[in-house]
């Protein structure tokens, strides 16, 4: 150990470039799909970080519609996090198999509350045997002033249009158009409510053809958990809400508590997709895989708001960390996620080529309108608040267990709080990032991300090479949408 105290040199994104290769591939022809598990496939290799200024339900919905995956952060109560997951799963669906419903003896107030909370325009009404007896929509409530009125007095009861279980979206669309309605309840032979198809869901399928969805046609979503006292309860609530993947998210994934928690969750939920991290070595990757992780998340200290490497003196430069972990993970057929340090779309290409199956982004997404960070004005420009989960504010709110700390009065932060420029809708940012990925794959002559990972080579560059890579000897007069200094 002592003789090998100083290991190899560590490299990060600015230390390397990919070598261009002979190519018969155009950027528009490449596939940016990536497979994390048999049941979890992304249409773009981008995951939004489980940070309290990056991902809540609004972001998770938006990025899933783009083809990626959002991880709901854990700085909230168990009930609130489960509700956020439920909101994503209910945001759109080919067929809603467990629609909300009310009974005729409930009040209009209850319907208004339910419809407002989940932003839905109507709700089926069933009797005590779950048989459909009516439907209540915004039109029925438009002129109601007394919210204590019973639903039975205002709902539509006559000439209900329904369809049998098994009706396809195409068939449902024809029925909806024919009868000029927006909601189509699905019932069995006895009239029991079994599902719901809405015109909005059909429109969303057309509007967002690249959406990442589960086997039931619902958007996919993940959620972060730690190794705190409420982890078991939190995981149970998230699974009940329909979460697609659990991220066991800690600053040091190669610790006894994390390994034991991964093993315990795997034993409790054999079919649950588990992403575990963060790690930066091959040994840590192997131990997490053996404990039961389906996917390993790599990155200790590379994030723009992370100070772990400065405060604790710990870390491995990200390109080296990704490569080392991927070298081990490929022996087990397990994918890895490169988490942190990515500033440009070119860094995503490098992370994937170094061994990543997907990347997790924080700062590149925190400035979009769908992120939960507060918007503020500074020196005449719009910004959004962005902070590390190791910052004082985030740790005081609930993420201190991620850094294995307990005392709120004596926290030692490993992150900072700041602001980043406001970027507008997520779609515009994703368009630029995916466009950069496609361009990089075209230069390398690789049609798929698997080929990018297997058939590319890096070249190390000097400081002069890095300066040459950026715009130089010119004053930028118009900011590009995908490049800032």
UniProtKB/Swiss-Prot annotation:
InterPro entries, per database record: Aldolase_TIM (IPR013785), CBS_dom (IPR000644), CBS_dom_sf (IPR046342), IMP_DH (IPR005990), IMP_DH/GMP_Rdtase_CS (IPR015875), IMP_DH_GMPRt (IPR001093)
Origin: domain of life: Bacteria
Residues involved in IMP binding: 304, 339-341, 362-363, 386-390, 414
Disulfide bonds: none
Domain CBS: start-end pairs: 95-154, 155-215
Annotated keywords: CBS domain, GMP biosynthesis, Metal-binding, NAD, Oxidoreductase, Potassium, Purine biosynthesis, Repeat
Binding site residues for K(+): 301, 303, 306, 468-470
Record's catalysed reaction(s): IMP + NAD(+) + H2O = XMP + NADH + H(+)
Entry EC no(s): 1.1.1.205
Residues at which NAD(+) binds: 249, 299-301
Catalytic residue list: 306, 402
GO MF entries: IMP dehydrogenase activity; metal ion binding; nucleotide binding
PROSITE patterns reported in the protein's UniProt record: CBS (PS51371), IMP_DH_GMP_RED (PS00487)
Description of how activity is regulated: Mycophenolic acid (MPA) is a non-competitive inhibitor that prevents formation of the closed enzyme conformation by binding to the same site as the amobile flap. In contrast, mizoribine monophosphate (MZP) is a competitive inhibitor that induces the closed conformation. MPA is a potent inhibitor of mammalian IMPDHs but a poor inhibitor of the bacterial enzymes. MZP is a more potent inhibitor of bacterial IMPDH.
Subunit relationships: Homotetramer.
Official protein name in the record: Inosine-5'-monophosphate dehydrogenase
Organism of derivation: Halalkalibacterium halodurans (strain ATCC BAA-125 / DSM 18197 / FERM 7344 / JCM 9153 / C-125)
Encoding gene, per UniProt annotation: guaB
């Amino acid at each position: 150990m002592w003789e090998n105290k100083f290991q190899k040199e560590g490299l990060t994104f600015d230390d390397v470039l990919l070598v261009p290769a002979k190519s018969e591939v155009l950027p528009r022809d490449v596939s940016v799909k990536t497979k994390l598990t048999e049941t979890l496939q992304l249409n773009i290799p981008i995951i939004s970080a489980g940070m309290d200024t990056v991902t809540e339900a609004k972001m998770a919905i938006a990025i899933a519609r783009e083809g990626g995956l959002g991880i709901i952060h854990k700085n909230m109560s168990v009930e609130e996090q489960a509700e956020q997951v439920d909101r994503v799963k209910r945001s759109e669906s080919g067929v809603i198999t467990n629609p909300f419903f009310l009974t005729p003896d409930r009040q209009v107030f209850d319907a208004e509350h339910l419809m407002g909370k989940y932003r839905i325009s109507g709700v089926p009404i069933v009797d005590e045997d779950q048989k459909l007896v009516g439907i209540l929509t915004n039109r029925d409530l438009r002129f109601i002033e007394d919210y204590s009125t019973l639903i039975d007095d205002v709902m539509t009861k006559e000439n209900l249009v329904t369809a049998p279980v098994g009706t396809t979206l195409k068939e449902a669309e024809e029925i909806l158009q024919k009868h000029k309605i927006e909601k189509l309840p699905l019932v069995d032979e006895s009239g029991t409510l079994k599902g719901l198809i809405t015109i909005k869901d059909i429109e969303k399928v057309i509007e967002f053809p690249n959406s990442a969805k589960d086997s039931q046609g619902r958007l996919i979503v993940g959620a972060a958990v730690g190794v705190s006292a409420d982890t078991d309860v939190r995981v149970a609530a998230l699974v009940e809400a329909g979460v697609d993947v659990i991220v066991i998210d800690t600053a040091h994934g190669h610790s006894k508590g994390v390994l034991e928690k991964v093993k315990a969750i795997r034993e409790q939920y054999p079919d649950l997709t588990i992403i575990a991290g963060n790690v930066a070595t091959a040994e840590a990757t192997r131990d997490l895989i053996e404990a039961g992780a389906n996917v390993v998340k790599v990155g200790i200290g590379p994030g723009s708001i992370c100070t772990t490497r400065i405060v604790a003196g710990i870390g491995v430069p990200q390109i080296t960390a990704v490569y080392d972990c991927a070298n081990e993970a490929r022996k087990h057929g397990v994918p890895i996620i490169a988490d942190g340090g990515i500033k440009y779309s070119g860094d995503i290409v490098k992370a994937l080529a170094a061994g990543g199956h997907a990347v997790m982004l924080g700062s590149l997404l925190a400035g979009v309108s769908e992120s939960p960070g507060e918007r503020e004005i500074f020196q005449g420009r719009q910004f959004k608040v962005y902070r590390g989960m190791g910052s004082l504010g985030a740790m005081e709110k609930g993420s201190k267990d991620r850094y294995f700390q307990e005392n709120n009065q004596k926290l030692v932060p490993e992150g900072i709080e700041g602001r980043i420029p406001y970027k507008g809708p997520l779609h515009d940012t994703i368009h630029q990032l995916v466009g950069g990925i496609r361009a990089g794959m075209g230069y390398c002559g690789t049609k798929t991300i698997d080929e990018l990972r297997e058939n590319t080579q890096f070249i190390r560059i000097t400081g002069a090479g890095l300066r040459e890579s950026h715009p130089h000897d010119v004053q930028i007069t118009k900011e590009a949408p995908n490049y800032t200094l």
